[in-house]
Design a protein with these regions (language model features):
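Solvent-exposed, amphipathic alpha-helical segments
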Residues: 26-34, 80, 84, 114, ...
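Hydrophobic/aromatic residues within well-ordered alpha-helical segments
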Residues: 62, 69, 73-77, 91, ...
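Hydrophobic alpha-helical connector segments
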Residues: 68, 79-112, 157-160
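Conserved catalytic core of Hanks-type protein kinase domains
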Residues: 105, 118, 163
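Amphipathic alpha-helical packing segments from all-alpha helical-bundle domains
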Residues: 78, 105-109, 113, 122-147, ...
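Helix-turn-helix
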Residues: 22, 26-68
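N-terminal intrinsically disordered/low-complexity leader segments
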Residues: 1-18, 148
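Hydrophobic/aromatic-rich alpha-helical bundle segments in the mid-to-C-terminal region
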Residues: 125, 129, 144-187
């Protein structure tokens, strides 16, 4: 049998090399689409076009993947939402831009909404608690910078955050708002 390089059959295409971040991102995609309970190794591997071995190369368990996905979401959410507002010196304009930002981004809302439904999960609850606390602190500080007293700022922050969570619950069941309608909503 001739096995010179010219006569060997082509090697089969290899699956892409995945990182732990790739697995965490696809887990977040599934959370957004189907919830925390839908995060399972075999379906994720099929979705990525790889074997379970790729998963176990990066994670010892589903819980470890879920933890990595939650950490990724927490970090990216912080950077995307609050990082983009750091350059705005006017606290009122910063709050307005924050409301516009959270009113138009759907993927982070979907993940957050699904995580709120899974608060009984031991990995989810502390992440939501940290994210909520950080958001409330940010809102309180912004309202303080806008001239409200500490107590007024805390109350306004809680009310604003509660309205945001309620907005997320109502949003999937309401007609989609146009940009102009959302701007009126903010006024």
């Amino acid at each position: 049998m001739n096995t010179s390089p010219a006569t060997l059959p082509p090697a089969p295409a290899r699956a892409p090399r995945l990182s732990a971040a790739d697995w965490a991102q696809v887990a977040l995609d599934v959370i957004a689409e189907q919830g925390v309970a839908a995060v399972a190794v075999e379906p994720l591997a099929r979705r990525l076009g790889v074997t379970k071995g790729s998963f176990y190369w990066h994670f010892p368990s589903r819980d470890a993947l879920l933890q990595a996905a939650l950490e990724r979401w927490e970090e990216v959410e912080q950077q995307q939402v609050f990082g983009s507002l750091e350059e705005e010196p006017d606290p009122r304009e910063r709050l307005r831009r924050l409301f516009q930002l959270v009113g138009h981004e759907t993927r982070p809302h979907a993940i957050y909404s699904e995580l709120l439904k899974a608060l009984e999960h031991p990995a989810v609850a502390p992440v939501i608690q940290r994210v909520s606390q950080r958001r409330l602190e940010y809102l309180t500080a912004s309202f303080r910078q806008a001239g409200l007293s500490r107590n007024e700022a805390q109350n306004r922050a809680r009310l604003t955050y509660a309205a945001y969570v309620g907005f997320l619950q109502l949003r999937p069941h309401q007609p989609k708002m146009t940009h102009e309608e959302f701007e009126e909503y903010l006024e």
